[in-house]
Curated annotation (Swiss-Prot):
Catalyzes the attachment of serine to tRNA(Ser). Is also able to aminoacylate tRNA(Sec) with serine, to form the misacylated tRNA L-seryl-tRNA(Sec), which will be further converted into selenocysteinyl-tRNA(Sec). Pfam families: Seryl_tRNA_N (PF02403), tRNA-synt_2b (PF00587). This is Serine--tRNA ligase. The lineage of its organism: Bacteria, Pseudomonadati, Pseudomonadota, Alphaproteobacteria, Hyphomicrobiales. It is found in: Cytoplasm. Consists of two distinct domains, a catalytic core and a N-terminal extension that is involved in tRNA binding. The gene is serS. GO terms for cellular component: cytoplasm. L-serine binds at T280, A281, E282, E334, S436. It is an enzyme of class 6 (ligase). It comes from Rhodopseudomonas palustris (strain HaA2).
Length: 476
């Protein structure tokens, strides 16, 4: 969320940064919404002030036994009492319109972020290691996993449909080992505090980290059947104005049938009992400081969690339809930092190095890309993507994203009202950062494809062998 005062004070600078994302200037329209809001507030405050003054004048008139003036003032107060709800409603409407507009526009890129329209504008920052040489043609992880009898997409489809997998035996254990290894390094060496957060969160948590409202269709939501039906009945009843004809049994019955037939898109209805399945532990971890004022002596605060993550991937039809690259459910180790504004730049570099370190210890070749303005995430000011080499992808292998490390400035903090208090005692918004440390499922793919052997077995990286009971090779 952006500061409307900063936009008012320097609209040209705001638009200059905003248009670097390939978007049209927007400062003028935001300022107009703010002017409407401020005018509505002024009218409401003037009416309230006049009502207060008139009420006092009534007492003075009565003391002076000026009944005519007292009657006129009472009539004025009565009229103000009638008109004020409309003025207050206008304030609320204008305020919500501005907040809605601000909530739907992305963060501004830092000046150092390279300009570009899409992923082709990303810049190769640095690389680690080299591609492995094989005396055979490397296979894809799904071919290897299915041949081992440890990766079952058909069984998953029977249970849950497409984009799910059942892992068994050695590969199930290997995935667990990877997650535990990542956590141990981040907590034992990198100073992160392990958290076991909720996987189901409410609307305001998703809004705080900016998954809502823009990316609603990419998320899974859950609500009880009772609440769903009640909400639809209330929604339809209100829409049909059935309250004015409560005896209209036919109308009420229609609403009930509509709820049962699931004919209403209720995703935008007010549903306080709805939950969202987290698309990343960033949501749960970052919202731990929502509506808080932290002591800056406690910052930076570093948190990590190993959780399942859930994504509908509504915009991914036809992409990565085979294998585990793009799943509705996957496991990920998340890194979150809460910092002061002065700390966030250095913390971003530190977070990247923490994510890199676990991949280095697995002996995986990767490259780090600085995302351009047209490819960075909605809430990000600057993002590094780590792309790991997967020799079984496509023709001759491919780099695939395994981690994104982003600094968000105070963009999320404003949405969450997360602040800190420094030595001067004045509260200010914190800065938030998040990164994958890393995606466990994709790390599993990278290990399978990079450590495959000609007979189809998988060598276990040295760093993971203690987590595998000393097992060195996963074989059929």
């Amino acid at each position: 969320m952006h500061d409307i005062k900063a936009i008012r004070d320097n609209p040209q600078a705001f638009d200059a940064a905003f248009t670097r994302r390939g978007l049209a200037p927007i400062a003028d329209s935001l300022i107009k919404l703010d002017e409407t809001r401020r005018a509505a507030i002024l009218e409401s405050e003037k009416a309230q002030a006049r009502r207060n003054a008139a009420s006092k004048e009534i007492g003075d008139a009565k003391k002076a036994k000026d009944n005519a003036r007292a009657d006129a003032l009472m009539a004025e107060v009565a009229e103000l009492k009638t008109t004020m709800p409309a003025l207050e409603a206008a304030v609320k409407e204008a305020d919500e319109a501005l907040k809605k507009a601000l909530s739907e526009i992305p963060n501004l890129p830092l000046d150092e972020v390279p300009e570009g329209a899409d992923e082709h504008g990303n810049v190769d920052h640095h690389r680690f290691g080299a591609k492995r040489d094989y005396a055979f043609t490397p296979k894809a992880h799904y071919d290897l996993g299915e041949a081992l009898g440890m990766m079952d997409f058909e069984a998953a489809a029977k249970i849950s449909g497409a984009r799910f997998v059942v892992l068994k035996k050695g590969l199930a254990r290997l995935e667990r080992a990877i997650g535990q290894f990542f956590l141990d390094v981040h907590t034992g060496e990198h100073g992160y505090t392990e958290v076991n957060p909720p996987l189901l969160v409410r609307d305001d948590a998703m809004f705080g980290t900016a998954q809502l409202p823009k990316f609603r269709e990419d998320q899974f939501q859950t609500v009880t059947e009772e609440v769903r039906r009640r909400t639809i009945v209330e929604f339809v009843s209100s829409a049909m104005k059935l309250g004015a004809s409560a005896t209209d049994a036919g109308g009420s019955e229609f609403a009930r049938q509509l709820a049962n037939e699931e004919l209403v898109d209720f995703s935008y209805a007010k549903m306080p009992e709805r939950f969202w399945l987290i698309p990343t532990a960033e949501v749960s971890l970052t919202n731990l400081v929502r509506e808080s004022i932290l002591d800056e002596k406690e910052l930076p605060m570093r948190l990590t969690a190993l959780t399942p993550c859930f994504r509908a991937e509504a915009g991914a039809a036809g992409r990565d339809t085979r294998g585990m690259i793009r799943q509705h459910q996957f496991t990920k180790v998340e890194l979150v930092s809460i910092t002061t504004p002065e700390q966030s730049k250095d913390e971003h570099e530190r977070m990247l190095s923490c994510a890199e370190e676990v991949l280095r210890r697995l002996g995986l070749h990767y490259r780090v890309m600085t995302l351009c303005t047209g490819d960075m995430g909605f809430a990000s000011q600057k993002t590094y993507d780590i792309e790991v080499w997967m020799p079984g992808q496509g023709e001759g292998g491919a780099y695939r994203e395994i981690s994104s490390c982003s600094v968000c400035g105070d963009f999320q903090a404003r949405r969450m009202d997360a602040r800190s208090r420094g030595p001067d005692g004045k509260p200010r918004f914190v800065h938030t950062l998040n990164g994958s440390g890393t995606a466990v499922g994709r790390a599993l793919i990278a290990v399978i494809e990079n450590y495959q052997q000609e007979d189809g077995s998988i060598a276990v990286p040295d760093a993971l062998q203690p987590y595998m009971g000393g097992l060195k090779v996963i074989a059929k």
